[in-house]
Amino acid sequence: MDFPSTLRPSLFMAGPLGMTDGPDLSFMCSWRDALTLPGAQPQNCRDQTSSFAKNLLWEPSTPGPLPLVPPGPDPWDPGLAAQDFLFRGGHYYQYQSRVVLDVTEQLSRFLWDHGDIAFAPLGKLMLENFRLEGNRGYSKKVTIVSVKRLLQDLGGHQPWGCPWASLSRRLRRFSILGGPVLSRSVSLLMGRLLHEELATRWEQLLMDEAFTGGALAWLPGRTARAGQLVYPSGGALDKLYFQEVSVNSGGNPRVLEDPGHIQLRGPVRQVVTSTVQGETLLAVRSDYHCAVWKIDKQEPPAPLQVLQVEKGATGISLSPHLSGELAICSRSGTVCLWTPQDGLQTIYKDPETLAFRDPSPWRWADFTAHPRVLTVGDRTGVKMVDIQGPPGCGLLLFCAGAEAACQKGERVLLAQYLGQPGPASTSLHLICTQFSIYLMDERLPLVPMLKWDHGLPSAPLLARLLPPASPGYPRPLLLGGQGGQVQLLHIAGEGTSIPQLAGPPQSLPSITDSLSAFPLLEPKRQQQLQERLEAPVIGLAAAPPCASAPGLLLFQLSAAGDVFYQHLRIQQTSSLREPDHPAPERPASRAAAPPVDQGSTPSWTSRASARCSRWLEALMELSPTNPVWAAPTFSHRRFLGHMERQKSQETLAQKLQAAMAKGQLLRPGDLGTLPKAEPPPAPQCSQQDELTERLTKAWEGQAAAWWKRHQDQTSGSQRQSKRPKRRTQLSSTFSSFTSYMDSPDASSAPHSQDLSNSEACPQPPRTPPSQELTQELWAQGVQHERRQTLRDYMAKLPLQDNPGPVATPPSQTSSRQTRSFRQQTPVLSGSHPPRKKPRMGF
C-alpha cells in the first residue's frame, strides 16, 4: 500500500477532470500551505479523460425495467402519504412555512376506532365508581353507576351519525365521573405518544434509513452467465428468497426454477454477500437480529450464527480479508466484531456523534484496506478505528463541514468501502450525502479526492461498484436513490493514479418509466398499478460484465417485493482512445453538460410487452377488494355473560307505529337487525346499442356523418308512423257510418227480440237499442281512456215513455246519429224536449 507518486493540487475538482478549466481551491483546510499553486495538468491525463467523457456510454435496451418474477401472493399496502399527516386547516400568524402534523384528527380517529386499546388501562382507576353486575348501588359518599344500563345507552348513541341523538342521565353522569380521567389522562398521554409516532413516520416518509445498503444481492454461479439473486419478499418482507437466474447471449435473464426461501421472524433490511478464498458468506440484517449463512453451490444455505441486538441494528458488513468476519453496529453507538473463532467482541462504543451534535441514532460500520482497521460513521462524519489499538484511538476520515465544502444541513447517508476481495485492493471510500458524493482516500484523511453533486431528488442509500467491462475501461459505479432514480458513474484511476470521473453520470430509467409498457386499465386498477410501480426501491444489484456477456444486467427490488431487471450495453461507437494519439485540444466549458445519445431511441418490443401483460394479469388476480367500513359497536357480553339480551317479539311495523303514536325518537338498537337490501342487478350492456355505435363513430372521426344520418332516420320514422295512424282513424269512422247505413234491418231484429222477452217475464230497465248503438258509434271516435266515462254517462240518461220502440226510417236514424256526432250530444227518439249541451268535456 504505497502513496501516489505525485500529489497534484487538483485533488478536489468541482466536476469531473477534463470538463472544467481549473481546480476549485476555495478551501483546502490544513493542506492549503502544504500544496503548491495550481499548475497545468499533463496533456496525456487531459486527453485520456476527454476520450472517456466522449466515447464511453451505456444505453438501455428497453425504455424501462421489466419484471423478472411474478408478484408475490401477499398483498402490499402502499402506506400513508404526505397528505395523511399534514394539517389541512389554515395557519394564522405564521411567518415562515413549516410542516404541521395533524395530531387532533389522528387522535380522534384512534379513540373512535380503537377504543378498547385506548381506554382499557383506565378500568382499574374507574372501578370504584362502576358496578359490572346488578343494579345501581346506593351510597352517600361514593356514586356507583351500573355498567349494564350505561352500555345499553352507549350501544344506540351515535355522536357522529344522528344529530338528534339524545343523552340520558346515565350518560351525563358518566361524563361527569369520567371527565377528569378520560379528558386529561388519555388526551395528554396518547397525544404525546401519537405526536412522537407521527414525527417518526414523517421522517421515514422523507427518508427510510432502515434499508441503507440495500436488501438485494447477486451471488455468482458456476459459470459467468449464471447466478443467484437473494432478496426478501412477502407482505412483511420476512421471507428470504434464493432465485436461480441464467443470462443468455442477448443479455436477457431467465428464471430457472421456483425459488427456495427461508422464513424469518422479522423483516429483512439489508443483505450482504462476500466471497473470500472460495468461500461465500451471506449476512442478513433485521431490526433486532443479524444472521450469517454459508452458501454452497450444491447444498442449501447452512446457518452459522444468529445474533440478537437489543437496541436495534443499523448496519452490517462482511470482511473482504478474512472469511467469516462480521461487523455489526447498533443504535446505541456500539460496534461489535463477530468471528467464528472468537465469537462476539465490542471494538467501539460511543453514544455521542463524532463531529457535532445530531439527534439521529443511526450508526454505520465497514472495513478498510487494512484487515484490522474499521470505519465507524454517523450523520456527522466517518472515523477510522484500529482494533488492536487502545479504546477511543482513531483518525477522522470525513467530517461534514467546511473541510469538505458541505452545505447547510448536509449529513452523511452512506459510507462504503470500494475495495473488492482480492490482492488488488484499493483504499478508496465512497461517502454519500443528500447533495453530493465524495471519494475519500484513507491515506489522505479529511481531503476529498473527488466531489460530485449527484442531483438525485431522493436520498442515495444504495451504491454498487462493479468490475470494468474490459481491461482498460473505467469501473462502473451504480448510485441508487430511494425514489427509484439510478445514476451510472465511471470511476477511472487505480493504484497510484488519481481517481476521477470518466465523463458525466448517466441517468438510467426508473421502474415508473415502465408504466407505458403495461396495457391500459380502468382508472381504479390503473391507480393500483401506478402505486405498485412507485413503491420505494430497497435493493440494487448487478450481474458484472464479462467476456462472454459484455452487457450489464441491473436488478432493482421494490418495497412491494417485486424484482425488475434492465439490460445495458455499450454503444458501438464507445471505445477507448490510446493516450499516444492525443485528441485536438478544445476549450473546456465550465458547466458539464450531460452527453447527448447519438444512438437510436429504445422502444418496447412485443416480447417485453407480453412479459408485462403476464405480470399484470397475475397482479390483478392477487389484488384484494377494499374492506367495507362498518360503524363500531359496543358489546358487554365478555364481562356480563349471565345477562342475556332481551329479544322483542314485536314486528318492525308495530314498533314504528308505537313510536309515532308516543312521539318518541327511535334508535338503531330499538329496531333490531334491519334486512339487508340486495344490490340491484348490473345493467347488461348490449354491444349494438346506440351509445356504442355513436362512440365508435366518434372515435373514428365520423361523428358528424353519424348524427346527420341518425336525424334523417328519426324524422322519417316519425312521419311514417303518424300518417298510417291518422288514416286508420278516418277510415274506421267512415267505415262505421257506411256499414250502418247499408244495413236497414240492423235495429229491427233486436227490437222484436227484446219485445218478446219483455212480454214473457218482467226485466229490469235497460238501455234502448238505439242508445246502445249510439254508444258503440260514439266509442269509435272517442279515446280509449274516455270510453268508460262515456258509457257511464249514457247509462244515466232517462228512458223513453213508451215501452215499445218506435220505428224510425234509416235515413232519419243516420242523419240523427250524424248530427249527434257533430254536436257530441246524444239525441233520443220520443217526445222529450231537447236537452242542454252537457258540460262534462265531451
From Swiss-Prot:
Keywords: DNA-binding, Nucleus, Phosphoprotein, Transcription, Transcription regulation. Residues 574-605, 667-690, 702-842 are annotated as: Disordered. Residues 577-588, 783-794 have a biased composition (Basic and acidic residues). InterPro entries: TAF1C (IPR038801), TAF1C_beta-prop (IPR049087), TAF1C_C (IPR049089), TAF1C_HB (IPR049090), WD40/YVTN_repeat-like_dom_sf (IPR015943), WD40_repeat_dom_sf (IPR036322). Its main location: nucleus. It is found in: Nucleus, Nucleolus. One of its GO terms (cellular component) is fibrillar center. Residues 745-760 have a biased composition (Polar residues). The modification Phosphothreonine is found at T808. It comes from the Eukaryota. Residues 809-826 have a biased composition (Low complexity). One of its GO terms (molecular function) is RNA polymerase I general transcription initiation factor activity. The keyword tRNA-binding does not apply. The keyword Protein transport does not apply. Residues 833-842 have a biased composition (Basic residues). Component of the transcription factor SL1/TIF-IB complex, composed of TBP and at least TAF1A, TAF1B, TAF1C and TAF1D. In the complex interacts directly with TBP, TAF1A and TAF1B. Interaction of the SL1/TIF-IB subunits with TBP excludes interaction of TBP with the transcription factor IID (TFIID) subunits. Interacts with MYC and RRN3. Interacts with p53/TP53; the interaction prevents the association of SL1/TIF-IB with UBTF and represses RNA polymerase I transcription. Component of the transcription factor SL1/TIF-IB complex, which is involved in the assembly of the PIC (pre-initiation complex) during RNA polymerase I-dependent transcription. The rate of PIC formation probably is primarily dependent on the rate of association of SL1/TIF-IB with the rDNA promoter. SL1/TIF-IB is involved in stabilization of nucleolar transcription factor 1/UBTF on rDNA. Formation of SL1/TIF-IB excludes the association of TBP with TFIID subunits. Recruits RNA polymerase I to the rRNA gene promoter via interaction with RRN3. This is TATA box-binding protein-associated factor, RNA polymerase I, subunit C. The gene is Taf1c.
